[in-house]
Amino acid sequence: MRISLARSRQLSLIIITTTCISSCQHDQSIPTRTQLTETSVKSVAVPPLVSQDFSAHWLTPELLLLPEDNLHQQHTLTFDDGGYIEKATLTPFTGEINRLLIPKHLRSFNVFEVKLATNKIKKVLKNKIYVSSASKGTNSKHTAQVQTAQLLDVLFTSQSNDANELKNFGATLSKDSIEFALWAPTAKQVTLLAFNKDKQATHVVPLKEDSNTGIWSGAVMNTQQEVYYQYQLTIYHPASDKIETLTTTDPYSLSLSTNSEYSHVINLADSKNKPNGWELQQDVLIKNPEDNIFYETHIRDFSAHDPQLSSPAVRGKYAAFSEKNSAGIKHFKDLQKAGINNIHLLPTFDIGTANENDTQVIDLNNPISKLCQLVPEHKLCGIEDQAITIQEYLETLPTATHERQAIVSSIREIDNYNWGYDPFHYTVPEGSYAQNPEGSARIIEFRQMVQSIHNLGFRVIMDVVYNHTHQAGLAPTAVLDKIVPNYYHRLDPISGKIAQSTCCDNTATENVMMEKLMTDSLVVWARDYKIDGFRFDLMAHQPKSAMLKAKKAVQAVDIDTYFYGEGWNFGEVANNQRFTQASQLALAGTEIGTFTDRLRDAVRGGAFSASGDDIRKSQGIGSGLSTMPNELVDRVVSRKAYLLAADQLRIGLAANLANFPLKNAQDKNVTGKEIPYGDQPTGYALDPADTINYVSKHDNQTLWDNNQYRLPFDTSTKDRVRIHLQSLSFAIFAQGIPFLHMGSEFLRSKSFLRDSYDYGDWFNKVDFTKQSNNYNVGLPPADKDQANWPLIKKVLAKNEGRDIVSPTDIEFSAEVFKEFISLRMSTPLFRLTNSEQIIERVKFHNTGKAQQIGLIVMSIDDAEKYQQVDADISALVVIFNTSTTAKTIPFKEAAQYQLHPIQQQGVDSVVKESTSNENSFFVPALTTSVFIKEQ
């Protein structure tokens, strides 16, 4: 029957299991990693199917779903078990159905009853399975292959002692043996291939399957020698529609060979795999999540252009974080002294888009001759001087043309740069950042980096990407999908194609063993690498329940770990259509933080995916909205947009709380959830730890570039710098947790590039010597920004150099940035720890219809009537004057306040002009001033 409608007609159902005969050749065009052996074995041929899809869903041993189709009245269940054919006529399921067994997106499907013994079903699952349907009295037939992920969970993970309870997947070392365990319930055969350190074969061990768990296991003797290994599986794979013999690495790998061709057996607890002093390092403790400040860092960006490294060998490597006197380390020490306490590392797990063999990649410091050794046909091979570096050649080219971006784009495939959002193995450090990527060497180097960052006084955050893999199917860097095809990835309910809404092949963390892999991996990073917290890429593509379970598991080994991530609601999981997502709204109250686009867009301007003039039209409060309209903006429209953005910003400053009270621009008393953000509420958080505030990160244009797109042409250099800093101040002084992009304090530019993920050191440069902010170093790559070239050229021409900053400007910006950080960390009033404190203590002034445009005024009270959180300060007032003129702000008893001593003694002479009078404050243009009232 259909779940919502019983049907009376008799139906029969066919499930067919088959194999095909063919040789298999796979795409060999991807050069980034050494490819694993992939061949097929011969088997019995079957007739071609009339039609094929994957719209059948086998959920439990008894229940199978098919889409409703009135033409298909007869269904037959058939399977081929080694030549033995069985058939059965079935009726629609008419019993009581537990709706929780039916995923939300399948609840319109018809339900059928399957009558097969469990052992028979487990055998059937090792072959091709499909449903054949025919209309009575016709020759019309339809076939649909079967999706079985939920059935696999029921069969192998629903009991108290089955696959998801095993704690030792992968390779486990004991004194006398090495034990291996792999979950592959649909495999016909699994063999362990063992190798020595020279990759010479030493053992071929057939593994044995436990039919209760689907786990294949076996062991070899522990001879105390290095052991590398692979798994060879005989398995039906829907990508080729054949029985394949596939050789792959271990999804539970803890160590790898160079370029991840072989898994490596390792004991992470062995002292030989730890740097000196590993057990003695001091982790930085955080009392409350709101005390965190995250500083987002890319490992290569940190040192790629540092002229003060002790050796070129550490450039772009883990080892650069252990330097003593590099420019980057000196700056990190300054940041720590100011109060930043977390270094957030962009992906550092093993990725599929970086060649780990340094002899096979180039960087800008290499001579053109090396480029020509790798790519003899490259156009630069025709120039006369092959000894000059690629960097030197790029510097000879004009800036306002497409020439530089063309060169950078042409070397993307062979350079050593990528952000790393391309998971290959989840639980091994990436080898391209190691000086030696082979086996345990990369692990020791990674641990040394973590130890060095800890010793500098920071916590270490890992950016993790469990929502997709680099590849799937039979592709070179696919692992999970070779071991249990169509299980670890989320499939379209009709076509069976792997969803790619994230960018790549989406994983299905709603499936038990994918959730387990994520959780087990996180525990390893926290326990064995002393990682202090995790940022989850596209977190809303994962279930809320999976995130809560993972957090609980990690906190069992590290009590003050913190989880945060991207809670964007989109794709095939949007609006909870498959499960309750780990999205912004759903995570409210969990203290799992989500990045808030509300404050971001109010400050920067929205339309992050816009192009051309639409970018320039989209001003934000931090880029001139209403106060500095550019030539494309209608002033009436601008004022209306400002009033909404200002209310959104106020809620953002109050930790984006759903229940925070505010008088809105229409003079109505509303709460944060009643202020609109598109078709969503502005306020969604129930705790300040739910909210991550930012105005710039690795995605999209940098804050500096964003503002240059939008500011009026005649804006002075000085004002551009002040505007940039003021935008940062919104994120820093907001309740919740600040997230800061490395180099934003240096006015960092990527020369307008929207998405720099694979565009090398040229566009991603960060100069810790503060000589350049990397602005106007060439038009950004055509692939991402060609539509914006006309606007960029116009902006550069009409700004007439006012957008070009000096080392003095950069130094000023860096110092004011550090002062802002010190201000935040000087008082817990900026770091209130629950919604009740914020709602009762934080107030906004200059609101409603009569508000002065360009003024956001926030007070935070610590008066006697409240439980005191600061022994020295009884109240503070933060005034953000985004207008181009000085402002006087009426405020009762303002004379009791003084400008914060950090600003009084700081480098900004303008903010020192801020004053408090009997009943008002005075704040200069484009200035954020913090006034305090002592206890």
What kind of region is each of these model predictions?
Residues 31-46, 51-53, 98-179, 202, ...:
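The feature marks proteins involved in alpha-glucan
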Residues 226-229, 914-935:
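C-terminal beta-strand-rich structural cap/linker in extracellular carbohydrate-active enzymes
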